[in-house]
Amino acid sequence: MAYRSDRDREGSAGFINHMPAFSMTHTYALPALYPYATQIADGEWAFQGEFAYNFKRKTPMGGRYGTTLKLNATYIHSLQKDYIDGFGDKEALKGTEGYKSPFFGFGDETYYTDVNLTLDKKITKKWSLTAMYMYQLYNQKVVEGHGINGDIVHSHILVGDVKYAPTRNVSMRAELQYLYTKQAEGQWVYGLYELSLFRSLMLYVSDMYNIDATKTHYYSGGVSYNWRSHRLQVAYGRTRAGYNCSGGVCRYVPASRGVTLSYNVIF
């Protein structure tokens, strides 16, 4: 059930209630490039499961500090709709009007699929590694209302995340990500470097580059400072146009470039 401030509003605008997507929330940039939004008006079947295994220490896979392997899978599909005579044009119907659906009825469209395998390993006391492979099927036509080079985006994504902490007060982290697809805007690559000092000051630089369609750099750099429950951040960068999902709420964000200043406090 969807409640809007205006019955005629479409897309992701005007919602009064909110239903978060039943899919994994990704924190890495490229796995989160095509975020899924719950299809409240059309309805959906959604399934998600996760399996994790910890390799013990002093084993070939576990090594000295142990290794964690996680497999997460999400599958979201349309509902079967048996239309009732007398309700007019099917395309003009809204919400749950004009059709019946059996409880375990599946339609013809897949909305979203996400299968990802993540490896977390502490190599030494100072070095740790996270590696991930992800396959994603994203129905751009359903979620965004349009498709680029096809309605369905099939993506293969690789992520490498290395952390190095030489002392208690200094730590560094680097990310390298790659997304391959023949749909939408094609291939992407992303890099990030973070430097944390005294557990309160952090500096970062990042760049997300589109290899195929626009050949554009979306760079960003900034500094943040944490003190007790306060956090202040200043950043400069370029943001691509597209859907931005935060806390499960997705909204369209226009392209921008400039300085951002943010302040957060926890009560």
Residue ranges and their predicted role:
Residues 1-267:
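Exposed, low-structure sequence patches enriched in small/polar residues
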